Amino acid sequence: MDRAPQRQHQASRELLAAKKTHTSQIEVIPCKICGDKSSGIHYGVITCEGCKGFFRRSQRCNAAYSCTRQQNCPIDRTSRNRCQHCRLQKCLALGMSRDAVKFGRMSKKQRDSLHAEVQKQLQQRQQQQQEPVVKTPPAGAQGADTLTYTLGLPDGQLPLGSSPDLPEASACPPGLLKASGSGPSYSNNLAKAGLNGASCHLEYSPERGKAEGRESFYSTGSQLTPDRCGLRFEEHRHPGLGELGQGPDSYGSPSFRSTPEAPYASLTEIEHLVQSVCKSYRETCQLRLEDLLRQRSNIFSREEVTGYQRKSMWEMWERCAHHLTEAIQYVVEFAKRLSGFMELCQNDQIVLLKAGAVEVVLVRMCRAYNADNRTVFFEGKYGGMELFRALGCSELISSIFDFSHSLSALHFSEDEIALYTALVLINAYRPGLQEKRKVEQLQYNLELAFHHHLCKTHRQSILAKLPPKGKLRSLCSQHVERLQIFQHLHPIVVQATFPPLYKELFSTETESPVGLSK
């Protein structure tokens, strides 16, 4: 009996297994461009999915980016989207090319070098795992009351850059990682973006808070009150406010009242909360305001606009899907740095992000909008609504531009956007919350902080001009409706090219658990 076909089949299986092993080993090396978790060799260089997609798009449209500084911008997980020119130059300098060799065609010298780097990374991880870990549980925490928070990616690495003085956002040493405990298990891509995976203990305690320069009012168990803040919302209320804040659709006076069991906070503590939210916002801004203002004179030419209009519908949808997904990842990082957010149960973290992340992106968009000529910053320059004609959803684009125009008329400061977007995200009226009271407490604290800041800066009048929450929900619904139409026309494009996080948040097509847990 001829066993040649059997041997050939066995060899093929072994080759496939070897390739999978090589890929998994390569992924221990961080992205050479930005330092994020890599996903393999792309265009000749070990990169993450984000840098792979960025390079692919830049080559597809022969993009000509420009740098507003000295063409030496640092490129890391936090700043990689701030300067496309320097990011592309780093890609090219490190050898990314459409003509780059495949992994299987590497020379022996290249393979040996790669193997040595893999071994180095594995040794570093092994050393970290062997380091002793001292963990102090919170006072009074017992058994199931001890909360653990899962941060999502292998070895606790987050998708975006971390600041060393923000423990909740820092990468967890492997020694802190252990299997998830009790509670719901999430395997979706939103969790992968920073809320699930190997769990990292981030229990809060008063002692830990003091050591980190924070006070106990950061927890959801502590409430700020108008009396302790020296605020009287009845006195400061704008004449046109009426009963704003008493329902789920406005941002007037605080929506919830303090509870007897919740400790009060002082004016100093409210000031600290304002500063904490604003700091978290500054560290997770996709683009710096000064850069956006400097670029306002850099407008797409008529020829460039025509080029965008001639693109296929699916290509423009893919581009916008990737840009929106990147913006959402920054919102995820912002949420994790918000005081009290990581103390919510995991289900409620997911619910708030799935419902509010795009709403936060829409509010942040007003920073990139120029009301003088009704243009928005997109892929390095400013352009009007006509730039997005190929999407085939002019009504949605017009609604988004109108919303940005209305917000820009309020002349928000960066701190006001920080506090406003925190309230957009932390909304106790979202359906599906399991511990609604905790979210109410956190929302109440943030509302007091927002009102305190507006009173301090004599800007209370903007409360009457803020768009109702229903407006943001309407824009998000329009987006989902247009996506459903596009998905019906181009299902393969959505399945094959759209980011997993985008598909999970918006697509109506349910993916298999296997696909979600990759």
From Swiss-Prot:
A motif (AF-2) lies at residues 501-506. Residues 31-96 bind DNA. Signal peptide: none annotated. GO terms for molecular function: DNA-binding transcription factor activity; nuclear receptor activity; oxysterol binding; RNA polymerase II cis-regulatory region sequence-specific DNA binding; zinc ion binding. Keywords: Activator, Biological rhythms, Developmental protein, DNA-binding, Metal-binding, Nucleus, Receptor, Transcription, Transcription regulation, Zinc, Zinc-finger. CDD domains: NR_DBD_ROR, NR_LBD_ROR_like. Residues 1-30 are annotated as: Modulating. Residues 109-118 have a biased composition (Basic and acidic residues). GO terms for cellular component: nucleoplasm; nucleus. A zinc finger (NR C4-type) spans 31-51, 67-91. It is found in: Nucleus. Gene3D superfamilies: Erythroid Transcription Factor GATA-1, subunit A (3.30.50.10), Retinoid X Receptor (1.10.565.10). Nuclear receptor that binds DNA as a monomer to ROR response elements (RORE) containing a single core motif half-site 5'-AGGTCA-3' preceded by a short A-T-rich sequence. Key regulator of cellular differentiation, immunity, peripheral circadian rhythm as well as lipid, steroid, xenobiotics and glucose metabolism. Considered to have intrinsic transcriptional activity, have some natural ligands like oxysterols that act as agonists (25-hydroxycholesterol) or inverse agonists (7-oxygenated sterols), enhancing or repressing the transcriptional activity, respectively. The AF-2 (activation function-2) motif is required for recruiting coregulators containing LXXLL motifs such as NCOA1 and NCOA2. Belongs to the nuclear hormone receptor family. NR1 subfamily. This is Nuclear receptor ROR-gamma. The gene is RORC.
